[in-house]
Regions:
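Conserved beta-sheet core of the metallophosphoesterase superfamily
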Residues: 157-247
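Active-site-proximal loop/helix segment associated with metal-binding centers of metalloenzymes
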Residues: 120-158, 162, 169-172, 210-213
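Short, well-ordered, mixed-charge alpha-helical segments that flank or form enzyme active sites
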Residues: 66, 112-116, 154, 166-168, ...
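Beta-strand-turn-beta hairpins that frame and shape the catalytic cleft
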Residues: 16-26, 151-158, 239
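A generic local structural motif
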Residues: 12-14, 42-45, 89-92, 145-151, ...
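Short hydrophobic beta-strand that contains or immediately precedes a catalytic carboxylate
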Residues: 27-29, 186-187
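Acidic, histidine-bearing metal-coordination/catalytic regions of metal-dependent phosphoesterases
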Residues: 1-28, 34
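Core catalytic region of metal-dependent phosphoesterases/phosphodiesterases
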Residues: 28-140
Length: 250
């Protein structure tokens, strides 16, 4: 009777990326270009260079895309083309500072705004390759790997933006990240550095971290907040052991 079942359009997602161990990773999140904080970004880059990182993971929301969001644009807001140009310049600067590093760029909820805008306002353009974010930001030419709708895994650690796990905001977000992931993970999205450690039933250490942001600390839409600038340096050994410096920029 199985042949009576109608066709299913379910598709298993295969968008996660697994990278090898034995590496040191600089994690930068939530730059929100063109509202990025230059001093905070430079501090993260400096620490990455002094730590001899060989990998950079951009943990999402590198772009803000305020101009194409569902929210009203502020007077004098930069055009979408200007936002893209500034994003290109930031990515070029990161690549220049880490010429030999592997660089990965995870899609955040602000990057999702581009697809949402096209689907709502010009759905017939949705499949045009020149309108894909990786093409607009020239990621291929800069040898930056785009990770759309997926996680990055390295050893026992997983890297995500954070919007994928709803309900992790508020008090103790790193612990909430653990309750959602059930494993070691690092996310951004919440703009507040925090860490949580526990052990599983076999005694294995599990650690979850929320990294700070690298954007405008007092945006017009949320001028009084408890956000903090920050980044992380993660070492993953050959054996898969993970050491995390979740740094706050004061």
């Amino acid at each position: 009777m199985a042949d009576l079942m109608p066709k299913s359009y379910y598709k298993r997602r295969k968008t996660d990326v697994t990278i090898g161990r034995d590496r040191t990773i600089l994690v930068m999140s939530d730059l929100h270009a063109p509202y990025h904080d230059i001093n905070a970004i430079n501090e993260a880059i400096h620490w990455g260079q002094s730590s001899n990182v060989d990998t950079v993971i951009l943990l999402g929301d590198v772009m803000d895309f305020h101009r194409i969001s569902r929210y009203p644009s502020d007077p004098g807001t930069l055009s979408f083309a200007q936002e893209i140009e500034i994003g290109n310049q930031i990515l070029f600067a990161i690549r220049e500072n880490f010429r030999n590093a592997e660089i990965y760029y995870i899609e955040g909820n602000h990057e999702v705004r581009l697809d949402a805008y096209i689907q709502k306002n010009a759905s017939e353009f949705y499949d045009l390759p020149d309108l894909r974010l990786e093409r607009l930001l020239d990621l291929y030419a800069q040898e930056i790997q785009w990770v759309s709708d997926g996680f990055i895994h390295c050893g026992d650690m997983s890297f995500i933006h954070g919007h994928e796990m709803r309900g992790i905001g508020g008090v103790n977000p790193s612990r909430k990240l653990y309750t959602k992931m059930k494993k070691s993970a690092i996310c951004g999205h919440l703009h507040r550095p925090e860490s949580f450690y526990t052990r599983d039933g076999a005694g294995k250490l599990i650690q979850c971290h929320v990294v700070g942001h690298l954007g405008d600390p007092t945006p017009n839409y949320h001028p009084r907040n408890d956000w903090q600038h920050g980044f992380a340096v993660v070492e993953v050994t050959k054996k898969g052991n993970v050491y995390v410096e979740n740094r706050t920029i004061s």
